[in-house]
Amino acid sequence: MTHATDLALYHFDTCPYCFRVRRALGKLGVEVELRNIYGDPRHLRDLIDARGIKTVPVLRIQHENGPDEWLGESGDIVAYLQKRFAK
């Protein structure tokens, strides 16, 4: 299992699009921090502050030398994960 410390997935448990991303993470053997927007109000506030909306899933990518990237849309997130982690 690979733990990607630069990634965090903003989600909620019953969201089908979030499930799609979590399933892809499992298939790729990648662990990321899961931030449930309804389980912790700080996560919801961070998401709204960054994107202006609370739509999930969103993958927060923390770049070493630059601003964080907030990637939305489950298909785009899965494509990013496959490109980065597929063997």
Which residues does each predicted region cover?
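GST-like domain detector, emphasizing the conserved glutathione-binding G-site
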Residues: 2-13, 19-87
